[in-house]
Each structure stands twice: as C-alpha cells, then as structure tokens.
C-alpha cells in the first residue's frame, strides 16, 4: 500500500511533496512517482479536505481530495471514479494513500483535474448583482449535467448528491463537469439503499417518504431543482428540515395522491396531509421565463418517479434547441463546447415525448 514518501523545501521556498501514486485508469496496475507543490486548502467538510496543488513536471493545477479510509472496506468513491470516462465528469488522474497523525490512521488521496468554478458560485454572483444568469448558460450547463447523468445511469451508477456545489464549470470554455462521487452507488434492483441521502433542497420526495428501493430518477429530480434554482435565483424548495422540505414541495406540486405516494414508497402507510392544490407553474417563475424552460421543469419535478424523463429524453427537449444551432455562441462570442450525444451509452432516449410545450 502506497505511503507518502517525502516533503521537502527547495531553494525557491517551494514546499514540494513527492509520492508514489497509482494511475487511476481502471484495470491498469501502474505506479508512478509524482511531485506537487503550492498546496493550499480550497474546501473541507465531513468527507475530509480538498487541496489545490501544482504538479511539478507539468505545472498543471490539480485538486487533491483527502479522505479518511476505513481499512475494513474498499473505498466506493475510488472504485466508481476509476470506471468513469466522460467529458462532463471530473477526471481522476492518480490516487495514493498516506498516514495520519494517529496510529493506524490511513488517508486516501484522490488527485483530480482542477476546474476553477462551480454553478453555485456563478449563480450566487448573478444573484448578488440582482441579475438573471444568461439563459444560454442555463441551457448549456443543464444540458451537460443531463449528459453526465445519462452516462453514469447507463452504467448503473446513481450520483445521489446532485446540487450546484457539485457542478464544476470552466467559465472560459463553458464546459461543466460533475464532481464528488462520495455518495454515489451502483443501484441494484431489489437491493435496499439508505434514504437519508442527497442534500436537502435537492432531495427527491421518495427519499423524504423513506423509500429504500429508489431508482436513478432521484438524480433527475435533483437536476430539475437545479434548473429551477438558476431560473429563480434561489432554491425552489428551501426546506428547513426533512418534513418542511416536503411542505415546500407540496406548496408547488399540491398534495400527492394516494397513488403517487404508493409510487414513491409502497410501504408508506400514513396519508394524513392537508389538501393543497398545485400552484400553476407559470406563476412559480418570473414573467419572462421561457415557456420551454417551464415545460421541461414541470415534466422533471414530478411526484411519480417513473413519470420523470430519463436524462437522454430530457436532453431532446425543445428548451435545448438553441444549443443545436450551428450559430450558437457564448456571450463572449466563443463557440460552444462540443455537445452532441457522442457515446454508445448516451444514444438511446426513452421516457416519452419531450418535444416541448404544445403550441
């Protein structure tokens, strides 16, 4: 098992760390010696710490995610990330293990490509300026999010924590990359999963109802709430607690029917809810919100999990037609990043007609 090798200072004052790391490509058992410097903390949480650093050989910026490793188990995030290869998913380059301060403490270090911004920070910037995020960005970022979901779902992986903070973007190119697979899991039919997953504002209602046999459609719901947030300038369902989260959803969708509750969790037996009518979608959003955007959200933010479109089908919605125009450009005048459905796992689209609002 790899251990951190050496940390030293050069005459320039740079603190350089040298490690023996494993190449991240799945099925490749190769170790390389790498060194990095200019390490600084750029994020932390219950999972561990994220550092920004530069690789000495190339001066390439990387993010190093350091998490405490339980020696009894394989790290699920590492196993999943080694399988992933998609332009809209952050790339794992190398990984290595290091010792902690305490006896027998072991850390897993994931060396990832660095992407400078997040959808969360960009949306907050526009909100502080009392401006709406340009619609071309909403379309561009959300299309790429759906592409990334189409890919991971096609290989059986559910992300389970879609939120603006986990959507990395390069403002210059407009490319979006999904990150943080710490909650991700291969979902197997009839195998139970924990329902307390996903950040509250973006949590699908079946999770709030305690479902353990949920599907990839929880990611689709989360994606819908992110699109809605970009259009509104604030979260669409800002619940203060698990129960309050359901209240916020009911305010918009109305009280779920008995059949809808059964579709979310067949084992849920309590049906005592105040009867509230659905709020018209066009009154949820600002006056000038495109009808296609509202139509897409109304199809995604749906109680019955099987009624939500697949990510592939959502990508075909009329809301994204502008991206398919050869004349489409970023506000800077730069061409859009490559967006066609370009992989065998992204071609098929099931989930009904997603053409857009009827005339």
From Swiss-Prot:
Do the record's keywords include rRNA-binding? no
Q: Gene Ontology terms, cellular component aspect? A: axon; cytoplasm; cytosol; nucleus
Under the GO molecular function aspect, what terms does this record hold?
A: ATP binding; protein serine/threonine kinase activity
Give the binding site residues for ATP: 42-50, 65
Q: How does it assemble?
A: Monomer. Interacts with axl-1.
This entry's Enzyme Commission designation comes to 2.7.11.26
Active site: residue positions: 161 (proton acceptor)
Key words, A-Z: ATP-binding, Developmental protein, Kinase, Nucleotide-binding, Serine/threonine-protein kinase, Stress response, Transferase, Wnt signaling pathway
Please state what the protein is called.
Glycogen synthase kinase-3
Q: Which organism is it from?
A: Caenorhabditis briggsae
- Its function? Phosphorylates oma-1, a regulator of the oocyte-to-embryo transition, enabling its degradation. Phosphorylates skn-1, preventing it from accumulating in nuclei and thus inhibiting phase II gene expression in the oxidative stress defense. Involved in mesendoderm specification and mitotic spindle orientation in EMS blastomeres. Thought to be a branch point in these processes as proteins downstream are not required. Negatively regulates Wnt signaling in vulval precursor cells and acts as a Wnt-independent repressor of med-1 and med-2 in the C lineage inhibiting mesoderm development.
Gene Ontology process terms (BP): cell differentiation; engulfment of apoptotic cell; establishment of mitotic spindle orientation; germ cell development; left/right axis specification; negative regulation of canonical Wnt signaling pathway; positive regulation of distal tip cell migration; positive regulation of engulfment of apoptotic cell
User: Mind telling me which Pfam families this protein's record contains?
Assistant: Pkinase (PF00069)
Q: Protein kinase domain: from which residue to which, for each copy?
A: 36-320
Q: Which reaction does it catalyse?
A: L-seryl-[tau protein] + ATP = O-phospho-L-seryl-[tau protein] + ADP + H(+); L-threonyl-[tau protein] + ATP = O-phospho-L-threonyl-[tau protein] + ADP + H(+)
Q: Does the keyword Isomerase apply?
A: no
Q: Which domain of life is it from?
A: Eukaryota
